[in-house]
Amino acid sequence: MKPTKRNKLTIASLLLSTCFLLVPGAHAQDNVIAAKDVEWGYLNPARGDKSPGAADLWGDRTKDTATGMLVRFNKGFESPPHIHNITYRGIVIEGEMHNDDPNAAKMWMPTGSFWTQPAGEDHTTAANDKTNLIYLEIDEGPYLVKPSKEHFDNGERPINVHADNMVWLQKSDLVNIAANGVSVAYLWGETSSVYGTLVKLPKGFKGSIKSNGDEFKAVVIKGSLNYTQNNTPRQIELNAGSYIESSTAAHHSVENANQSETIVYVRTSSKFSVAD
């Protein structure tokens, strides 16, 4: 069939439409999970309801891959001394947590506190409040619990940072801040590769978090955000424990409509920016 002007126009239109689909948009490859939609299981399925609850937000804790998960503990929970096969990081979302050497006095860490637990290091974990929830992150898996007798020294040392000792900066090489009242706290990693920070958004903040790399993961640690998706009027309420992810450059439109600050944990492979 001989191409006509109409056929050529149709083909050109299809090609142009395809090009627009391939260009990374403001919300391309976004994945948003509200805390209320998280699917829960057990951190140690063999122990059933005696085990802390666990929910993968990204990755798979049972496989050899990086993973971010929520873990919840009942009041009075205290583990026996144990080790893990891999290093993990923990951030308290709700309640009070203790994580230290088996002989250490209890230091209860509230919302916004951060700790690291090196692979092979003997320790116990305890929870003090009625409801206790943390975000736990690993760079490799699977996440396993092993007896203390198998302890080893992997060369790393544990860190416990109480929320009151967090250092907040309004100017940093971690992130470009172009909004009043926004501050960040460095937690781990190298800014030339993958790193983690806490971002504090003041009450009334309305703006965007712009990610530029191929990995951007954010978890609401304290407070809540209204998230506008795909440039539509539709807003998603993201309470503590909710999750945002993008794998291309993206603008994440967020609003803190609370009467208090909201804190978000960000894991990223590239410098990001916050603007109102």
Predicted regions and their residues:
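Glycine- and acidic-residue-biased ligand/ion/polar-headgroup-sensing regions
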Residues: 74-77, 84-102, 202-205, 209-231
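Conserved short histidine dyad/triad with adjacent acidic residue
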Residues: 58, 64-83, 108, 116-120, ...
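Bacterial N-terminal signal peptides that target proteins for export
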Residues: 2-13
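Ligand-binding loop in jelly-roll beta-barrel domains
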Residues: 119-142, 214, 239, 248-272
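Short acidic-glycine-tyrosine-enriched beta hairpin
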Residues: 102-120, 230-249
